[in-house]
Regions:
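A penicillin-recognizing enzyme superfamily signal
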Residues: 1-205
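C-terminal functional modules
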Residues: 194-238
Length: 238
């Protein structure tokens, strides 16, 4: 769970601590357990990892049965896990406020069977729901809003062709498989700048189901995009 601190803290790892400081009755600090943290990954990588793990609790994800985010409308990211032969189950998840890791298993490993969903999710829901109660109460006050996950200012969003990885052209939208657009985040300076060189527009005979030739009736011809596949062979092929 401690490793996940770098995702929510813009790439800075913070070691777990059971206390921050101890003071006497006059407020004098007797023990100080402050920790500055260490840079483990870049801010951009931390943001991208959080974006990826935000999909896990959503519909279709391995933690889709998690109720916390739908109940409280607080940002959640995390990852489920399981050991070989389902001896152990995990869920480590975090919000902009706290990180919580849950392990489910036996002291002496044995198969965990007859469980439709990851049991760690219910425990995580209960624990995180309780410790976020003060945040939910604060949200009811005028002007108060929940914290949200930070997105690095050095990231840009870009739409590209999923076949070439380059910027879209009109041909990409005429692929027989449907629109080939994909949207992703990139570190500034690494986003695609060239245009797709894989899709090629051709005249297509919709009746014959093949590339049109000069004898095809004009009324049967439409334009479609085919993907140009570069083949490289170790030797010259005749």
């Amino acid at each position: 769970s401690a490793a996940y601190t770098m995702f929510v803290n813009s790439g800075i790892y913070s070691k777990p601590r059971t206390y921050l400081r101890v003071t006497d009755s006059s407020g004098n600090v007797i023990l100080d357990n402050g920790y500055e943290g260490k840079v483990a990954i870049s801010e951009e990588t931390a943001s991208l990892m959080t974006m990826l793990m935000e999909t896990v609790p959503r519909t279709g994800g391995t933690a889709a049965s998690l109720e916390f985010d739908r109940k409280y409308d607080i940002d959640v990211a995390g990852k489920t896990g399981s050991a070989g032969d389902y001896f152990d189950r995990w869920f480590i998840g975090y919000t902009p406020y706290y990180i919580c890791g849950v392990w489910y298993g036996y002291e002496y490993p044995k198969h965990i069977t007859d469980i439709a969903t990851n049991p760690c999710l219910k425990v995580w829901d209960a624990v995180m729901g309780k410790i976020h109660e003060d945040k939910v109460i604060s949200k009811l006050r005028p002007g108060e809003e929940f914290l949200e996950f930070n997105v690095s200012s050095n990231l840009v969003q870009c739409t590209f062709c999923k076949d070439s990885g380059l910027l879209m052209t009109d041909a990409c939208k005429l692929d027989g498989r449907g629109n080939r657009a994909e949207t992703g985040w990139f570190v500034k300076g690494t986003e695609p700048i060239g245009y797709c060189d894989k899709h090629v527009l051709v005249d297509y005979d919709s009746v014959e189901g093949a590339i049109a030739c000069e004898w095809c009736p004009p009324e049967n011809i439409t334009q479609v995009a085919l993907v140009k596949v570069d083949r490289k062979f170790p030797i010259e092929v005749a």
